[in-house]
């Protein structure tokens, strides 16, 4: 724990150090600004790619569907935190992994170093629970400026803030209880800390995005036409960017609820019928980075809806060069536009 704190507090900026050959696939640099960190869900790995060459420069996860010290099962989220990488080991649902047709658990949130060593984790490998140091399908984790970690513990119907000493210091949602009323959630899929101290939650099965304060009151909500709220982030202009997964679209809505921008991932050439995008992140250049899950791609689109970058081959799952398998999350290293900065 002390090592983690030393590493994080001594990191003045994102490093651009060479990655060790035992971890890097092709050598080169690690955590370079502009690289893309991808949670390659059903390939059971987190990868960092150079967007200019499409080459993988760093990876965590050996492809195993069993949670272990060098593996991660169906990761749904990853974030660069100084010299470390925060990873949500979500676990695969039934039918997601051929090697475990009934589903395979991971249930860990981990801080991993460049060598692929786990320096900190909350949750126990393959153990599903709601007690101390236990999780149930953690789909997202956000490292907070105070060094706590905000975890969207989906199967336990809660968002929890935990310290690096594994103490829960705040919770929204009642453990194991679904609902849409006061302090309840239904399959939450993401949570972001806002500048005002409130928490923005994508409450997936309630088909809504809510902003809640620390006293558990909803102070803002958007639910108009939403089906499967997968992710939400608050932009600097006060708008909210929402991944409306089951409607296969990304929308930007004003504080008053007006849709000011929209992009449909199912309308592009080669798309499957229901790609169910899972993450949309606004970038500093004004474009939007989208994890277009079942189209097997991460794409960057501009305000006009033109694709200016893609990683992966549309509708083709694989582990080879420039291939992905149901990518769930992607972020540009060093770009926290609209996201909680660590």
Region annotations inferred by a language model:
Residues 16-342:
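Histidine-/acidic-rich catalytic cores in large beta-rich domains
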Residues 1-12:
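Bacterial N-terminal signal peptides
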């Amino acid at each position: 724990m002390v090592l983690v704190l030393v590493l994080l507090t001594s990191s003045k900026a994102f490093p651009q150090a060479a990655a060790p050959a035992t971890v890097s696939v092709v050598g080169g640099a690690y955590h370079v600004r502009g690289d893309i960190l991808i949670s390659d869900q059903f390939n059971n790995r987190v990868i960092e790619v150079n967007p200019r060459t499409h080459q993988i420069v760093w990876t965590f996860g050996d492809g195993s569907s069993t949670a272990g010290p060098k593996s991660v099962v169906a990761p749904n989220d990853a974030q660069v935190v100084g010299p470390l990488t925060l990873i949500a080991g979500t676990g695969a649902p039934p039918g997601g992994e051929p090697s475990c047709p009934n589903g395979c658990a991971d249930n860990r949130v981990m801080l991993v170093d460049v060598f692929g060593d786990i320096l900190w984790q909350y949750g126990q490998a393959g153990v599903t629970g709601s007690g101390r140091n236990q999780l149930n399908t953690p789909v997202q984790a956000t490292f907070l400026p105070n060094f706590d970690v905000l975890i969207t513990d989906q199967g336990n119907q809660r968002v929890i803030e935990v310290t690096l000493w594994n103490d829960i210091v705040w919770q929204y949602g009642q453990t194991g209880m679904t609902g849409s009323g006061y302090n309840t959630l239904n399959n939450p899929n993401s949570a972001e800390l806002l500048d005002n101290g409130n928490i923005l939650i994508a409450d997936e099965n309630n088909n809504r995005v809510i902003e809640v304060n620390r006293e558990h009151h909803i102070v803002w909500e958007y639910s108009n036409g939403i089906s499967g709220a997968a992710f939400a982030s608050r932009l600097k202009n006060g708008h909210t960017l929402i991944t409306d997964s089951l409607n296969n679209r990304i929308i930007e809505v004003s504080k008053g609820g007006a849709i000011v921008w929209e992009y449909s991932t199912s309308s592009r050439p080669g798309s499957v019928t229901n790609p169910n995008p899972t993450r949309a992140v606004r970038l500093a250049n004004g474009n939007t980075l989208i994890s277009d899950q079942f189209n097997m791609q991460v794409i960057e689109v501009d305000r006009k809806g033109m694709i200016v970058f893609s990683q992966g081959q549309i509708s083709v799952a694989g582990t080879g060069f420039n291939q992905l398998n149901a990518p769930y999350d992607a972020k540009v290293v060093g770009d926290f536009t609209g996201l909680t900065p660590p």
